[in-house]
From Swiss-Prot:
It comes from Mycobacterium tuberculosis (strain ATCC 25618 / H37Rv). Its main location: cytoplasm. NCBIfam families: T7SS_EccA. ATP binds at G357, P358, P359, G360, T361, G362, K363, T364. Part of the ESX-5 / type VII secretion system (T7SS), which is composed of cytosolic and membrane components. Belongs to the CbxX/CfxQ family. It is found in: Cytoplasm. Disruption phenotype: Deletion mutant does not secrete EsxN and shows a minor reduction of PPE41 secretion. Gene3D superfamilies: 1.10.8.60, P-loop containing nucleotide triphosphate hydrolases, Tetratricopeptide repeat domain. This is ESX-5 secretion system protein EccA5. Keywords: Acetylation, ATP-binding, Cytoplasm, Nucleotide-binding. GO terms for molecular function: ATP binding; ATP hydrolysis activity.
Length: 610
């Protein structure tokens, strides 16, 4: 007999001796119960024949669950079950188990379950990548082993706090063959949901782990998480009751004790984006903090808003004074941000702005573009512009006006408010002042002052009317640091605006064709009257300036559609053509003198009927 053969034979004898000392009968021999001898014999067997997988598994059976033993068993996996089958030892007699380090002991009954047990121990040893690769290489044939692979992969994700992956491993609808795996998986899914801030769903899912108390450790985790969910939603008394229950079940459950000792103790919340941003997928500390993630996201959105605001402002026709004022405020804001970054003092300034001029001259558009710029400069949190007016805020009683104003302003915090026709806030005709207007103004004043770092108020209206309204409350006048004037569009600007609005939908309005509108545009511009407050009101103001021009273009398109509704149109619709000649396209793009003249007539007629 060669030396290797002798060593293998000695290893088998040691294996038999170890099994007998473990209380397992072999070949009819009477077993004993001597764990120390069993462990020594199994160790001897693996030393003599490292390729005997069952000897390594026997060491697990004897209580040596070190990672080295599992590594040895996996290295010898080709001989899995050979020795026990040779000796006639059944699976019921020889059933090594390994703790997953969290909830369960995993029985090793197959090559795939050995891989799972080894992966669980690797994960406990923080050798996450090795565990993941081992699980990825496992292709279980038996449904029970397939469940075990899913479970251990869930354990790996749970240990590394990859919460979306935990939820993917333990979907609620899955029917588990092993109820213990289901309970432990539910506990991990509960923690995942709570850590992602889905508290109500986490609280509900926890019941799967708690009911029946199949896995006490899983039930403890689920109860603890329920308690923390209650704390996060402000139900502290109920939270403490659950935490005490956990502590009474397991006094060694440290998180419950910490949560009871410290009412400010909370779960660490995260989100899928932060988890995916990790530089090491297995290390939660390699991810940017939630604050850093939010800052990066905000910076990206800020750049977008700034670019959009600049583009919208630059695309507006005319309004050079308004553009200059906005650019000045933007420059001042940027300088103040730089001063703050350098540690220099920065005066607290408001950006509340009066936009004075007739309707339809771009006041709302400027307010929206400016708000986006302020978002881009991180002065405001959101590009929201809440449009309101006296009519929208009034209620049946004076208290309604105050309440409606407060609710509107609360919703606008972080963004802006656009008060249309702000000069109507305070109306004449009341013997002791306008109580409704005063209620709105007083509430507005509080927010303009106390929230000037997170709210911008735009007041729009005619100049002289606004001046008289502001005389009622000098405090309101002082809150507006910027005044921008808007003017009626001149005839040539109205022509340019007509062409610009046509281009928005790839319509063609030539300079020559558009001249049909010039006499009327000039007439509307030259018509003048004065309001009761002394504001100059031109005919084009009464029509609506840009709003009127848009209506002219829309009515002109309607006339073109009627003009084109002929046999040629029917032929185009009936054909299978997908490409058309320039001549064909021109018919559907150009607005003729007749179209524009009819559009003007229809727009004026519509205005007169309103």
């Amino acid at each position: 007999m060669t030396r290797p053969q002798a060593a293998a034979e000695d290893a088998r004898n040691a294996m038999v001796a170890g099994l007998l000392a473990s209380g397992i009968s072999v070949n009819g021999l009477q077993p004993s119960h001597n764990p120390q001898v069993a462990a020594q014999m199994f160790t001897t067997a693996t030393r003599l024949d490292p390729k005997m997988c069952d000897a390594w598994l026997a060491r697990l059976l004897a209580g040596d669950q070190s990672i080295e033993v599992l590594a040895g068993a996996w290295a010898a996996v080709r001989t899995f079950g050979w020795e026990t089958r040779r000796l006639g030892v059944t699976d019921l007699q020889f059933r090594p188990e390994v703790s997953d380090g969290l909830f369960l002991r995993l029985a090793i009954t197959s090559v795939d379950s050995l891989a799972c047990a080894y992966a669980a121990v690797l994960a406990e040893a923080k050798r996450y990548q090795e565990a993941a690769e081992l699980l990825d290489a496992t292709d279980p044939r038996h449904p029970f082993d397939a469940e075990l692979v899913s479970y251990v992969r869930g354990v790996l994700y749970f240990r590394t706090k990859r919460w979306p992956d935990v939820l993917a491993q333990f979907p609620e609808a899955t029917q588990w063959r092993h109820p213990e795996l289901k309970a432990a998986g539910a506990a991990m899914a509960t923690t995942a949901l709570a850590s992602l801030g889905v508290f109500e769903e986490a609280f509900r899912r926890a019941q799967e782990a708690i009911e029946g108390d199949r896995v006490p450790g899983a039930a403890n985790i689920a109860l603890y998480t329920q308690g923390m969910c209650l704390r996060h939603v402000g139900r502290e008394e109920e939270a403490v009751e659950l935490l005490r229950r956990v502590y009474s079940r397991d006094a060694k459950f440290t998180p419950a004790r910490e949560a009871l000792d410290n009412p400010n103790f909370r779960l660490i919340l995260t989100d899928p984006e932060t988890i995916e941003a990790r530089t090491d997928p297995w290390d939660p500390d390699s991810a940017p903090t939630r604050a850093q993630t939010e800052a990066a996201r905000h910076a990206e959105m800020a750049a977008k808003y700034l670019a959009e605001g600049d583009a919208e402002l630059n695309a507006m026709l005319g309004m050079e004074q308004a553009k200059k004022e906005i650019k000045l405020i933007k420059s001042t804001t940027k300088v103040n941000l730089a001063r703050a970054k350098m540690g220099l003092p920065v005066p607290v300034t408001s950006r509340h702005t009066l936009l004075l001029g007739p309707p339809g001259t771009g006041k709302t558009s400027v307010a929206r573009a400016f708000t986006k710029q302020l978002c881009g400069l991180t002065v405001l949190r959101k590009p929201l512009v809440v449009e309101t007016s006296r009519t929208k805020l009034l209620g049946r009683y004076m208290a309604d006006a105050e309440k409606n104003t407060e609710e509107m302003l609360e919703g606008a915090l972080g963004g802006a408010v656009f008060f249309d026709e702000m000069h109507t806030l305070h109306e004449k005709g009341y013997s002791q002042g306008d109580p409704y207007g005063n209620a709105i103004i007083n509430t507005l004043l509080l927010y303009m002052e106390n929230h000037r770092d997170e709210l911008v108020v735009f007041g729009a209206g005619y100049a002289k009317a606004m001046e008289k309204m502001l005389e009622v409350n000098q405090g309101l006048r002082r809150r507006f640091s910027t005044v921008i004037e808007f003017f009626s569009y001149t005839p040539q600007e109205l022509i340019a605006l007509t062409q610009l609005m046509g281009r928005e939908n790839e319509d063609v309005i030539t300079e020559e064709e558009s001249q049909v509108l010039l006499p009327s545009y000039t007439k509307f511009y030259m018509e003048q009257s004065y309001s009761e407050d002394g504001d100059l009101i031109r005919g084009i103001d009464l029509l609506g300036n840009a709003g009127f021009v848009r209506n002219v273009v829309e009515k002109a398109r309607d006339h073109r559609s009627f003009r084109l509704d002929d046999e040629d149109l029917d032929a185009v619709l009936a054909s299978d053509l997908t490409e058309f000649s320039e001549d064909q396209l021109r018919r559907f793009k150009e607005l003729t003198r007749e179209d524009l003249a009819e559009g003007l007539r229809a727009a004026v007629a519509e205005k007169k009927t309103k």
